[in-house]
Each structure stands twice: as structure tokens, then as C-alpha cells.
Amino acid sequence: MNQENSIVTRSDLCRRIESLPQVNIGHYPTPLEPCPRLSEALGGPKIYIKREDCSGVAFGGNKIRQLTFTIGEAMYQGADTIVHGATAQSNHCRQAAAVAAQLGLKCYLRLSRDHKSFVQGNLLLGHLTGANVELVDAPFGPELDVVK
């Protein structure tokens, strides 16, 4: 049987994940919080919310899980700078800038300007973490698809 068709066990998967370069930046595991009123309103299924906002870096969020590996790989390869681009209020860029500051990396953020690009929220936090922030008129993400 070739490797593409082989079954990967949980222990195999854990071993493979653990072998990847990563940085310890999150506070895990994040808690599960019961939602009894929502459960009752929906007729009984027990509903829980995973509290990724408790992951610890720059007000938390699920992006920290990805950055654990992408920045881990970058550092493994000797990078001293990270570059991210998205919209001005990007959660991912906010967290990337905070992680870079925490780890002593330089950070450049290239963010698309919009009519609401006041220096507040995630854009302000990018500045406060010491990232080099450049606002550009070029679109990113779904906005870019519209331009195409």
C-alpha cells in the first residue's frame, strides 16, 4: 500500500505534528464554556463554546494556533522578520504583530486601506506592538476577487 492510501492513526498524526517546527505562544488548552440557555432554546442538545479568546496573545483568537506553526517554521529557517498582509482591521495581522513582538522578530504589515481605516482596534494594536504598518489602496481577500 502506498503512503497516499495508508491510514494515519491518532498517535501517528500527533507524532507528525510534534515533529513540525513550532513556537510555544498560546495558552492551551482553552476552555469549553457551556451555553445552557442556548441549549434550552434549541430543545436540549448540550452546546458549548470553545473559548479561543483565552489563548493568551493580543486578546486571543484561533489564529494563534496557525501562527504556532508558520512562525515556528520561519524561525526554524532563520527568519528574523515576518510580513503579513490583509485588511486594516485583520485579526490575523494583529496576532502576528503581537507574536513577532513577543518573540523579538521584526514585523511588517501591509494592510488595505478603506474608508474606515482609522487608527483604532486591530490597526492600533499593530502599531502598539511595534510593527511597521503600511496602509495601501490595493484590495485583499474577497475585495481582490471583485477587482479581478
Residue ranges with predicted function:
Residues M1-K148:
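PLP-dependent amino-acid enzyme catalytic core
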